[in-house]
């Protein structure tokens, strides 16, 4: 009987080790674990929702490839020949803060938010002809830490949740004619939920076409 029990010990040890490896992999206890196939698919689907927001005029008008900001749903050049400037905040005598205050000025139709500025050219989401970059290209820019101010997945989620100029897209105020500016195709809560799904899936990007 003792010999029989002793003979079982290696099998029990192997079984316990296999179970630990399975559980660790399934719940993230083991090193770098690739997302499961269905998790990646969910992440890619969530990314497409994110992309629909990032390429909406409320976002892409400040994520330009041009030397100037854009305005309106048709994304025309900013009036008064405003230009980007060295820090994305305009130039002396015509900087962003000259007109754009901390909040929207609905009486004049001038939008506003804390630290109003253009996104850096490393975060441009359009090509030189003002066409939105592909989903794959935008995704690779957003996840490239050499371009996105060194933000990994959790930092990107926090940025989408809390950054003042991100939040502005869902409170864009009125145009000079008094009509409301359009908002992105998702609510902010939906946008954050999609970002969370994408981040938890490992921030997958679609293949380049």
Predicted regions and their residues:
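N-terminal export/targeting leaders of redox proteins
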Residues: 1-51, 71, 84-87, 104-209
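Short N-terminal amphipathic alpha-helix/helix-capping patch enriched in small hydrophobics
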Residues: 46, 55-58
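Processing junctions and N-termini across compartments
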Residues: 53, 90-93
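The canonical Cys-X-X-Cys-His
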Residues: 57-66, 93-103
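Short recognition patches in nucleic-acid-associated and regulatory proteins
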Residues: 70-81
